[in-house]
Regions:
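Conserved hydrophobic/aromatic beta-strand scaffold that supports enzyme active sites
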Residues: 78-80, 112, 180-182, 202
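Long amphipathic N-terminal alpha/beta scaffold segment
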Residues: 57, 64-98
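N-terminal strand-loop-strand
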Residues: 83-127, 156, 160
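Conserved GNAT acetyl-CoA-binding A-motif
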Residues: 40-51
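Conserved beta-strand-loop-alpha-helix junction that forms the acyl-donor binding cleft
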Residues: 49-56, 134
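Nudix hydrolase/Nudix homology domain
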Residues: 2-11, 15, 19-30, 38, ...
């Protein structure tokens, strides 16, 4: 019996090819048992097993032989197995990434929103910056412009990254990074996203910074946007595809 078809990586890992997995659980169990012994004898450290959802009936057999869940996607489950005890297995994604836009018009008014789903309707609106989570593979500058437009109807131009907050214990045991960006509005007519946003308006900056119902954090990040030069998007000629990488650097560097 041959080992299940696989590739390897430079870290001593074996990556089982999903297309090489049999449909029958009993056949898979026998092949997997033989393969693990073979890979262990060859000195590999870790096995990565991606099971397509169409072959999910194989998962039980993998778990029975010592595989552990690592992460999942819409159409697959990734499992891992340590051929050598205590071999390092890198964790899956550790962070969520979000961005908020500081959008100020020529009248020194700040674009703010209050979310619809925030508990009691008796509380005053909790005004904050428009923004939200980045999509998979989306650039930060693109995401914050998109989120501002989706929530408020305001088209905006990305100017610079101002500051960010790093928060542990956010959701499902992961951490969260929230980037604060300065944007220039290209129009001023608000078209509110009714599904998520209860209130959306242009608020005088002074009123926002003095308001009791605006959190200290939200005031501070707006102050940072007003006072900090921040870092701007740039490109590096000797680097890889700009569609895959995004750089923010102080302006004026040679």
């Amino acid at each position: 019996m041959q080992a299940i078809n696989s590739t390897t990586n430079r870290f001593g890992g074996v990556l089982i090819l999903p297309e090489a997995l049999p449909d029958d659980p009993e056949t898979f169990a026998a092949q997997l048992h033989h393969s693990l012994a073979s890979w262990r004898a060859e000195g590999f450290l870790v096995v990565w097993l991606e099971v397509p959802i169409a072959k999910s009936k194989l998962i039980h057999e993998a778990v029975e032989q010592g595989f552990a869940f690592h992460h999942s996607g819409d159409g697959y489950l990734m499992l891992t197995y340590q051929l050598v005890a205590d071999s390092f297995i890198p964790p899956y994604s550790t962070h969520y990434i979000g961005a908020g836009g500081v959008v100020i018009n020529d009248r020194e008014e700040l674009l703010v929103v209050s979310e619809r789903y925030r508990g009691s309707d008796n509380r005053p609106p909790h005004y904050k910056l428009p923004g939200g989570a980045l999509n998979q593979g989306e650039h930060l500058a693109t995401a914050v412009v998109r989120e501002v437009h989706e929530e408020t109807g305001i088209e905006a131009e990305f100017q610079r990254l101002v500051c960010f907050r790093h928060w542990h214990g956010y959701r499902y045991g992961k951490s969260d990074i929230y980037f604060v960006c300065r944007l220039r509005p290209l129009n001023e007519t608000i078209v509110k996203q009714d599904e998520e946003i209860a209130h959306c308006l242009w608020m005088p900056l002074g009123e926002y910074l003095d308001a009791e119902h605006v959190s200290f954090f939200n005031k501070q990040i707006v102050r940072a946007a007003l006072s900090s030069p921040g870092v701007a998007p740039t490109t590096m000629e000797d680097h890889r595809n700009p569609e895959l990488l995004e750089f923010f650097m102080p302006e004026g560097l040679d």
